[in-house]
Amino acid sequence: MSNSNQQAQIVIPSSVLGQITALAMTETPLECCGFLVGDFGSDIAQEFHPCRNTAQSKIIYTVDPKDHLRIERDAEERGLAIIGVLHSHTHTEPYPSPTDVAQAPDPAWHYVIIGLKRAEPETRSYRIIDGEISESQIVSA
């Protein structure tokens, strides 16, 4: 059992955070989405890969399956893996919605949400395991 005083974390380089913010600002008012790639089982995001939101919605996102497959294959060919998924909340807090929780496919992934509700974008990360949400600290490298 993990130490409850130690919060989980994900390391996201400032350049990657900049890419995420730029995508979210470009796509608003629609939600944006993409994948974080790093070493398998790692909590260090080395890359961000934007995906098309096939839902074309202000309130939900659906990753284009072709983008997902392309990014996953490319990562695997280079000995890397998808370690997290990113999407934006354009008008709400950066906290997982019931839909986000219900559709969380991998308990090992980080679920990163950038909120655009306020003047300054706010990026937060979570783990979603068996419907339970726990926040992870984002460490900018």
Where are these regions (language model features)?
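Conserved beta-strand-loop surface patch within small alpha/beta domains used
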Residues: 1-82, 91-141
